[in-house]
């Protein structure tokens, strides 16, 4: 069985408190984005952990990959290559892998998401996909982008 799920949490709008209760309309407009984001992230993390625990209890050899599509983007600020803190915050993806009986080597530790499935297939299904170069792009407009991986990845 293969299941792919894109969970839209903790994306904006930030509507959940850390215990899963909905915030009030007043709180929605009063809370700072960072505070609201962290509360919703805590709630999301607890739900993801519940799912992972159920998968581990039900299946003896599950393959589990949990990833974010990007890091925290405060107010959806424009990201520029001269703002290191904004770049680091925005592109700090979360990646967690559970492959039964397999430990990834340092060369296989993904720095970006581009190789996630290549690593999964190579380690679990006998493939030999070459790992791609890590790249991170910011877009100045629809037709112009800049690779900033050299700035964020040592």
Where are these regions (language model features)?
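Catalytic domains that recognize anionic headgroups
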Residues: 1-154
């Amino acid at each position: 069985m293969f299941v792919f799920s894109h969970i839209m949490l903790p994306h904006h709008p930030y509507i959940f408190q850390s215990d899963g209760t909905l915030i009030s309309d007043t709180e929605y407009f009063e809370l700072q984005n960072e505070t609201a984001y962290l509360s919703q992230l805590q709630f999301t993390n607890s739900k993801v952990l519940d799912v992972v625990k159920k998968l581990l209890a039900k299946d003896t050899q599950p393959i589990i990959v949990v990833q974010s599509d990007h890091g925290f983007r405060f107010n959806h600020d424009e990201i520029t290559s001269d703002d290191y803190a904004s770049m680091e915050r925005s592109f700090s993806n979360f990646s967690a892998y559970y492959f039964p009986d397999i430990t990834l080597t340092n060369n296989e530790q993904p720095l970006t998401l581009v190789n996630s499935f290549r690593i999964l297939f190579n380690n679990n299904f006998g493939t030999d996909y070459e790992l791609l170069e890590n790249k991170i792009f910011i877009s100045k407009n629809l037709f112009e982008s800049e690779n900033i991986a050299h700035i964020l990845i040592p």
